[in-house]
Swiss-Prot record:
This is tRNA-cytidine(32) 2-sulfurtransferase. PANTHER family: AMINOTRAN_5 DOMAIN-CONTAINING PROTEIN, SULFURTRANSFERASE-RELATED. Belongs to the TtcA family. Disulfide bonds: none annotated. The keyword Nucleotide-binding applies. Its cofactor is Mg(2+); [4Fe-4S] cluster. It comes from Pelobacter propionicus (strain DSM 2379 / NBRC 103807 / OttBd1). Pathway: tRNA modification.
Amino acid sequence: MLRTPKAASDPMTLTQQEMRELPLFRRLRHAVGKAVADFAMIREGDRIAVGVSGGKDSYTLLLLLEELRRRAPIDFQLVAVIIDSGYPGYRGDIVRDYVTSLGIPCHLETTTHYEIITEKRRPGSSYCSICARLKRGALYGLADSLGCNKLALGHHGDDFIETLLLNQFFVGSLKAMSANMLADNGRTTVIRPLVYASEEEIVDFMGQVGLPVVSCNCPVSDSTDLKRRRMKELLKELEQEIPHIRSSMLKALSNVHPRHLLDQQLQGL
């Protein structure tokens, strides 16, 4: 958690106009606008469910998409969706109240994910992977029930890079994330408009605007995902020697040469 949760009316929170005047907000808006254009993420008439947890990434995503919606020459709708997984102490109401204060339609879904994980998780199995699968399923279901054809998630550029490294180091797969992909259910298109934004920019932005950040209150959040944490550390170490490593690795994901890889299914492409 970045800071103690606070009400949306907290005087430290900037107004919408004050936020729009921030140079960093304009830079992030440009990054999201470029991603939306590059990957054809949003079209006329789209109804987009935006996953909002109350964390820095999802808040940033929602604010930037709302700004794009306000300025866009096409018509599309946003619906914020909040999943309360049942972790004791999670304050989904704070998130809902803030989103509602922005005039954005919002749906808070309460689930029993915490009970399911506690009862069903096998010893040694990943807590985070089970939680992620349950939450993803809930988001797809909500997008369907709310009439949304797209689901926007708050993964930023560093998430793409870290996922690439994790799959290479621990899975033996050349795989990261997609910025615009039809989900396995065949109905929901998942978009990730923060692909060109860095985690550092998002942290700085959140520090400037003072939003009511809320922790998910996962009981193992401080002790799990050690592999991803190591990837973050590795990137920081390499960045000392190669300052542009993050932008270079992100660029590599859109500059693939199949003939120079070993996957036989790619031969001839």
